[in-house]
Amino acid sequence: VAEDITARKDELGFAAFTSAGMDSSSDWRFKTHLANLPIYFEYQADGIGSTDAIKGTYLDNYKNMFDLYINNSTCAPTELAGKTGDDSRNEFLNNEAVFYQNGSWEYTNLVGDGKPFTDDDLTMLPIYIGVGDEANQGLCTGTENYWCVNGTAKQEDIDATLAFMNWVITSDEGRKSMSQDMGFVAPFDTFTGEYQSANPFVQIAAQYPAEGKTPVSWNFATIPSEEWKNGVG
């Protein structure tokens, strides 16, 4: 599909992919999120959840996908070093490309407040790199963030923090703020009915496992270092 779009780019007036910029505001999408896919499938093949040394079993698959991005893009590969995250987003907003790699957190930058898209204009697709059971593959799903309480703080501060965290996920105001106003993924059993996220990307992510498809877990915590990621990038 991407290569067909490129072959007809002048006729269609748009490209397949937004620019895969290697500026620091953009490169995390590829040296972390896209790079997670070959790591995930390597772990799946080896039956592990972490390793002391990533073998790179599926690095060729990763390279093929990235080559698809940069050779079917809004710009020439030689221009990518200076392309930013804003450039990529704006290309998508201006209907210059069909595909834009990003996550559910990007929703509010694309819909509402004068943005050109409605919920019906957008969807999310798994990234298939030619490995595993693609017919039953879901979206890449995970988090790098956790709620923590400082165990060395005063007990009164610990209690107040825990009370606030409980309020956020149980009160009407807290739940509405998280799921509706901010559009966050809220993986708590208190977020049912009207408190389910209004973010359609979150709903799509939930739909895949409901249909029996397996999410691709985030394995970022096992990536050796930022230097390793920079080498990949």
What residue spans do the PLM features occupy?
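Glycine-centered hinge/linker elements that transmit conformational signals in sensory
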Residues: 48-82
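Short, hydrophobic alpha-helical packing/hinge segments within bilobed ligand-binding/sensory domains
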Residues: 2-5, 88-92, 106, 161, ...
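Extracytoplasmic/periplasmic solute-binding protein
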Residues: 2-51, 97
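Extracytoplasmic/periplasmic substrate-recognition and gating elements
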Residues: 74, 113-181
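Short helix-initiation/N-cap motifs at beta->coil->alpha
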Residues: 79-94
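C-terminal capping/gating helix-and-loop segments adjacent to ligand/active sites or protein-protein/ligand interfaces
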Residues: 141, 190, 203-233
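Paired acidic/hydrophobic, glycine-rich loop segments that form the ligand-binding mouth/hinge
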Residues: 98-102, 123
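Beta->alpha turn/N-cap motifs
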Residues: 85, 102-107, 143-145
